């Protein structure tokens, strides 16, 4: 046929059997990739420390999606929470992976069958014997089935009626676990961070889909609408399908990047806005102040802070810090976190408590500046020591640690104080193992960043694909060089005498 590479799909344009075959093969590839990728991730995943070495630090991509849907156990005897399990059941990580690979094989065989047996009676109009597809009817069937699936997922899987539920956590992502979720039918259901909204929206959207599907199965489209939207053209189906996909891709890119109940921090890592707004830092300060007010010492108060919460307040876990072209997981950047050193508090020689100005997201380097409670500069690490006025040495700055590995220790020598000031600029201080993975010290992004970038990019490409195929189907006659006038002249039944405009038939009024 001699088609260029970008036009090869023309061969299935008027061949429903082989169109089904290529879609089956595509689904087989997707399911096979998902299962294979899951097995690979399970093989390289280290479940030993879910607090300081969680899945999102290790670059896991499909694992978080499995966990949020209720899969937490492995046939290897471990769980996502770092515990041991004796009976993981079939629906473990490996079980789901095997099911996908098995499904992939069946779809592969189905694709081959449909490619060989392409000319089925099903694709022919029983009245004329000509190849024909009833696209509005097919639309109704697909809408009904997808509505049924959507409703079933919300009403059974998520509610725990017949399924595990979904991943639910507190506002600071400390106590996350899989549990059944009740639907939220009030205004609170529109809060993107409320898991109940996910349930109610699936149930509601499913009901709408079922009703809409039944409507389209029982009501034929008006002739004018059918013609205006080119409902008889398979490229219309392609165009509208692409629009549904790019719209969904834009939505999930947003919910992933800005955060939502469906993209929990424990599974995908923090968002950049939680660093920008000092979300976790403020919560730690609130907890400490509350404990101190209740009579606890600073050391006791900071020791009650979970290491998990402290680790979220570290810039290396900010997905916007990793460049898009820096390959590898976060652990390949700053290393594998081993321990929290504690909360660093700085003081100058006059006894003023100082805090290090935190590095903004989009800076690779930033001056180390120590300010007092009023925001006044009191000390820094100067660029040019000869002209310095506020150096650590000149201001007699010391650092004390509360909580963590260095709890109760105070350092007064300038080089050590500077070291911890540089660490404090990046949030809470942690000790990292950079040897095991040969980590290079350059920050990487989490799965949150990769997912967002990928889906936003493909959504944009698919948007243009929608315009392209929509334009082709709407203006097919123009692109083919056949004007409306010519079409009318040769169309059977438009005139009493073919091509004679003076014999136009009157439409039935």
Curated annotation (Swiss-Prot):
Membrane spanning stretches = 21-36, 101-115, 140-156, 203-218, 237-252, 457-472
Q: Superkingdom of the source?
A: Eukaryota
Q: Which GO terms describe its molecular function?
A: chlorophyll binding; electron transporter, transferring electrons within the cyclic electron transport pathway of photosynthesis activity
Q: Which GO terms describe its biological process?
A: photosynthetic electron transport in photosystem II
Instruction: Please tell me where this protein is predominantly located.
Output: plastid
Give the membrane topology, semicolon-separated if more than one.
Answer: Multi-pass membrane protein
Where is this gene product found?
A: Plastid, Cyanelle thylakoid membrane
Q: What are the alphabetically sorted keywords of the record?
A: Chlorophyll, Chromophore, Cyanelle, Membrane, Photosynthesis, Photosystem II, Plastid, Thylakoid, Transmembrane, Transmembrane helix
- List GO terms (cellular component aspect): cyanelle thylakoid membrane; photosystem II
Q: Which InterPro entries did the record assign? A: PS_antenna-like, PS_II_antenna-like_sf, PSII_PsbB
Give the matching Gene3D superfamilies. Answer: Photosystem II CP47 reaction center protein
Q: How is the cofactor bound?
A: Binds multiple chlorophylls. PSII binds additional chlorophylls, carotenoids and specific lipids.
- Matching Pfam families, A to Z? PSII
Report the function annotation for this chain: One of the components of the core complex of photosystem II (PSII). It binds chlorophyll and helps catalyze the primary light-induced photochemical processes of PSII. PSII is a light-driven water:plastoquinone oxidoreductase, using light energy to abstract electrons from H(2)O, generating O(2) and a proton gradient subsequently used for ATP formation.
The record ties this protein, via HAMAP family, to: PSII_PsbB_CP47
The UniProt family comment states: Belongs to the PsbB/PsbC family. PsbB subfamily.
Query: Subunit structure, briefly?
Result: PSII is composed of 1 copy each of membrane proteins PsbA, PsbB, PsbC, PsbD, PsbE, PsbF, PsbH, PsbI, PsbJ, PsbK, PsbL, PsbM, PsbT, PsbX, PsbY, PsbZ, Psb30/Ycf12, at least 3 peripheral proteins of the oxygen-evolving complex and a large number of cofactors. It forms dimeric complexes.
- UniProt name for this protein: Photosystem II CP47 reaction center protein
Question: What is the source species?
Answer: Cyanophora paradoxa
Q: Which gene underlies this protein?
A: psbB
